Each structure stands twice: as structure tokens, then as C-alpha cells.
Amino acid sequence: MLFKMRSFVAFVLLLSWFGSCCSLKDQAVDFLKSEDSLKKDLSSDEDSTYLKAFGFHRKTLVRNPYKDLPSRKDRKNRVVAATTTPSSSPEPAPKHVSTKASTVSEPQKRSSTQDVSPSPSAPLANSPIPRNSHSSVPLVVGCVGGAFFLLLVATGLYFFTSKAGKTVNPWRTGLSGQLQKVFVTGIPVLKRSEIEAACEDFSNVIGSCPIGKLFKGTLSSGVEIAVASFATTTAKDWKDSTEIHFRKKIEMLSKINHKNFANLLGYCEEKEPFTRILIFEYAPNGSLFEHLHYKESEHLDWGMRLRIAMGLAYCLDHMHQLNPPIAHTNLVSSSLQLTEDYAVKVSDFSFGSSETETNINNNTVIDTHISALNPEDNIYSFGLLLFEMITGKLIESVNKPDSVDSSLVDFLRGETLAKMVDPTLESYDAKIENIGEVIKSCLRTDPKERPTMQEVTGWLREITGLSPNDATPKLSPLWWAELEVLSTA
């Protein structure tokens, strides 16, 4: 929602800027028009003044200035006539005078007309002033082009951010050249038909879990996935409370995002046929429980066990430092999966508030005797797992020492850990007793007296010298490769 609001504000600001550009363009055009009009008016005034001066000089040169003056002979005749008889009417002026004047002034008229002809450089009154039409083109093109480009950018950002929080579908199984964590912007919704094809029509069953059956799937790219399918097959058996747990589980798993965690990659929900499925990263080397307690499984040496312990510690420390902290709900050796290079992948297939009841209904065989609800419970479970990895003995709890083995009670009473080491281990570190002290601090009866996972991780790193990078899977099937997801329209 926040992305949409930001995009909308950016879009409004862009429109406002575009309107300002258009207004600026109109003002610039009006200014150019007024400038051309002013030039034209000034030119017209100059031409008018020039023509007036030209007319005045022309009239002055054409007129004979001596036309009205009497000649000497006329003055003499007038004197004689005045002395003899007064004339009743004045005699007209002799024609030769005006003729002479006309004769004299005609060349002057022609000469004056030729002399005052306007110069070629002077602007003519009737010739229009050419307008500089090219001066406004760059301004208009720049404003329109820039506004159009920014409009495209804003539109693209709006549609991109509006889809950022949505789930995506369908799921293309190809690989791209760059890592992308699909759970960063939302867990994708996958089609049942795609999962069905990857799991060979759900025939490749690899086990069971509190959710239901666990399948192995292989994408067209060769990437392997783990598919956990809920046992419920009808909508009437799927309660509203169960749906709430389902969505909370997806939300919780999507926040973990750690290299030593079996991350959630997608989920499927369909009405016909009724389907609820979770898709996880797959670790091909089975569980820690199998390697510790089944002779047929690959033997884990001392270095491999320490690496598994450190990967688990780093993952739990990451989960506990989230806001709010996330505690693993079923932290046992059967929930720790191993990759090709025997790095740990912490899986969490538990579901609902009562996992024991879920397991009974689904006839599953996974260990669910511990249901941790807070980080302090995870610290206790981590201490039990450390003891199990070193001794090879399965211990349920300090409160149930007779259920499997009493060695844990003996250890807590002062027995050295070196005397309890798994007999299949050919060698082990001399600092094993230091690890024993860490185990004892994790198994304190009062949860408030137990150390934090951050403190435990720091102690073990100092003892083993293994960094987070040392405990990270080197060939993680989906961490270094990306599942390319196409968003729906």
C-alpha cells in the first residue's frame, strides 16, 4: 500500500510538472509573438517617418519658388499703367514666365525624384517581417519529449510497485543468470498441475511429516524440491482455524531466509481438487537422525559434526534476532536435513498447535516430542542435539532419563564428556570438554538462567573456529540458483 501511495504522489507531481511545462511553452510562444509584433510596429513607424520626410522634400523641389515674383519688365509696365489709367482688372501674368519656371523646375523634379529614392537596405512598409519560427522549436520539443519520458518512467514504477506485494503465478521452472530470492516480495502461488508434473504425479514419496506426505520433485532445469502435501482432501474437513494456521505458517516461514534453513519457495491452494501444499528447498543426504542412528547411512566424522552444529547455531541465532523472534517449533535431529556437502538445512514441517495429535491422525513417524514455543526452549533443544551428535545417543529429555539412556544424567552429575563420545568416531578435538560446558549451560532447569543463542554461538565459534561461511552449504540446490517466477497480469 505504501508503494502505491508513493507512486500515486509521484504521478500527480509529474502531471503538475507537465502542466507547468505546457504553460511555459505557451508563455514563450506569446513572448515571441509579441516580440515580432513589436519589431513590426517599430519598422512601420520608421517607414512612415521616412515617407513623410520624402514627401515634404519632393513637394519643395517640384514647386518653383520664384513663380509668384514679378519680372523687371512687369514692374515697369505696372508703373506706367498706374500713372496713365488705372486698370479695372489686373492683367494675368505672362505665360512665358510660368513656362520658364516649369521648364526650369522639370529637370529638378526628375533629379529630386532620383536623388531621394529609398536605399535598398531600408525596409519597405508593405513587406512583412520574417518571423523566426525556428527559435521556439527546441523549447517545445524539449518540454514535450522530457514530459513524455518522465510519464513513461512514472507509469512503469506505478505498475511495478503495485504488483510488488502480490503473489506470483505461474511458476516457470527455468533458471536465470542471477540469484533472486523469491520469498523477498511474497511467496509465490503455484499451480497443482506444475507441482504434479515435477513430482511425477505425486508418486515419488520420500517420507512423512506433521503436515502429511513428503514428496521429492524435480524441475525441468534439474533442480530438486521437497513438496509437503496436507493429508486433508476435502474442503469440509478443512476448518477455518486450520486455514488460519496454514497462512500463519507461510508468513512465518517467509521471514526466515537463511542459508542453513530449508527455505519456503512457494505454496499451492486450489478448490478442485482440494489442495494445500508447501514447497521447500530439498537436501538430498537425508536427516541427521538417519546418519547418527542408522548403520546403513554415511558415517559423520568429528569435523562434519562440528560443521553441522555450527550451521544449526548460526541459523537459530538468526531466527531469534528477527523482530519478532521466531522459535523453531520442532527442533530434533530428524528435522535437520543434510545437503550434498553435508551442511545442515534446518527444516520446519510442523503445523498447528497440537503436533502430537496431527502425527497420530496422519500415521507419521517423525519425532515431535518437543514443541518449542519460545527461544529458551530452542536453547534447551540445542543442548540435547549437541549431546546427541557427540555421544550418538538419543536423549528425549533430562526429565525422562530412563526412556532411552541414562548417560545424560551421568554427564550432568559430573561424568566427563570424553568418556561418552560416540565409539564410531576415530578421533575428536581436545576441546571437547569446553563443548561439554556449553551443553550444561543450555540444559539448565530454569529457562531464565540459560544463555541466549547469540552467546552460545559465540562460544562455539571460539572453540571450533568455524565461521558462518564455513558452515554454509557450498552447493545449495536453490540458494545459488534462482527459480524464475512470472507475475500474472
Curated annotation (Swiss-Prot):
Family: Belongs to the protein kinase superfamily. Ser/Thr protein kinase family.
Record carries keyword Cell membrane: yes
Keyword presence, Endoplasmic reticulum: no
Domain description: The protein kinase domain is predicted to be catalytically inactive.
Residue ranges with Polar residues bias: 99-116
Pfam family, one: PK_Tyr_Ser-Thr
Extent of the signal sequence: 1-23
Membrane side Cytoplasmic: residue ranges: 161-489
Region (Disordered): 67-130
UniProt-listed PANTHER family: PROTEIN KINASE DOMAIN-CONTAINING PROTEIN (PTHR46084:SF8), PROTEIN MALE DISCOVERER 2 (PTHR46084)
Membrane topology type: Single-pass type I membrane protein
InterPro entries in the cross-refs: Kinase-like_dom_sf, Prot_kinase_dom, Ser-Thr/Tyr_kinase_cat_dom
Keywords: Cell membrane, Membrane, Receptor, Signal, Transmembrane, Transmembrane helix
Any one of the GO CC terms: plasma membrane
Protein kinase domain: residues covered: 200-460
GO molecular-function terms, A-Z: ATP binding; protein kinase activity
Location, primary (coarse class): membrane
Highest rank taxon of the organism: Eukaryota
Protein name: Inactive receptor-like serine/threonine-protein kinase At2g40270
Extracellular side: 24-139
Subcellular location: Cell membrane
